[in-house]
């Protein structure tokens, strides 16, 4: 039993995170130097994301009997994303107004270091709904795979899957090759995941070593408020959605616990994307649904990021005494409904979208971003964890709505009555 525990990825990642925190706290300079370990692991994951999405989506779509089902799945997914992410934005807005974590700080924007956020502000200028939509179309197929742009790869994979389906029996050989290639790719993922403890250790040691636990104290009220809001969102909102769909949110969280720990260590929900594709399919969701919902959700269904954006924007207003009446807050909400869709599931993207939103609203001082620049990295974990759980729940919900969910398999796996519910831990 003890040997099995030590070999489990869950235990190894958890231990690595704890060691990383201790190293970063007691030896901050050494901890800060561990950054390449975390970066290398995330890069290895990103290396494999494009082929995983391509194989999953192509085989899922080409293997379907009707192409109408694909369109229906996409429409249902986008509707769900819009509804739930809007709820997340509103919840963040309500709680930050009730708790008011920035009230009483009386910060003069003129005293803030605007240079510290200049890079993010410059990147934010490139954000926009037209630019975002145009960026979905790749300049070339090779370019889409080379850059690892999830939506570009997804677009090409959907078109390829449709074309392959239309070939019928003539395309069977290509289908078999891609399916075999998919098995090889998931084999590579299993090898990469063996390095997850090292990546989690490096990323956590760097975070604590560079920013220090002390940086949490000054703006701790915002951090605590944000974490509690994310927990409430997962338990109450996603929990209710899960219950209506027919499963327990707590059992689901237990099922993806390894992926959650990897995300906690790397602070990027993207690092768990390949494994989520595999685990959601083994949970009873059809491959075509998983292939469409999970990758799309990484741009359109970032619940944690949505909560963060409203709370951070209003916090800056409160801290700098920039009065926001109901009209300003509604304007903020409308802008965020658009700008939040441009955030990807990678570290730092939420802060860039926040900069874009504040610039677009115009009522808030952009220099106010400097207030949360130092603690943004600590809030990134809660964003990423909430995003991951949200996309997992979305996949099950959409699969049920389009009648592509194996309810018996879902129940068996979550209740450990099937082998799939026990064999996903990687040990070595």
UniProtKB/Swiss-Prot annotation:
Give the transmembrane ranges: 4-24, 44-64, 76-96, 142-162, 184-204, 222-242, 289-309, 326-346, 352-372
Question: A Gene Ontology CC term for this entry?
Answer: plasma membrane
Is the keyword Signal in the record?
Answer: no
Instruction: Kindly provide the name given to this protein in its UniProt entry.
Output: C4-dicarboxylate transport protein
Q: Which NCBIfam families match?
A: PRK01663.1 (NF002461), PRK13027.1 (NF009587)
Give the function comment from the record: Responsible for the transport of dicarboxylates such as succinate, fumarate, and malate from the periplasm across the membrane.
Give the record's membrane topology. Answer: Multi-pass membrane protein
Instruction: Name its cellular compartments.
Output: Cell inner membrane
Q: Would the keyword Cell inner membrane turn up in this protein's UniProt record?
A: yes
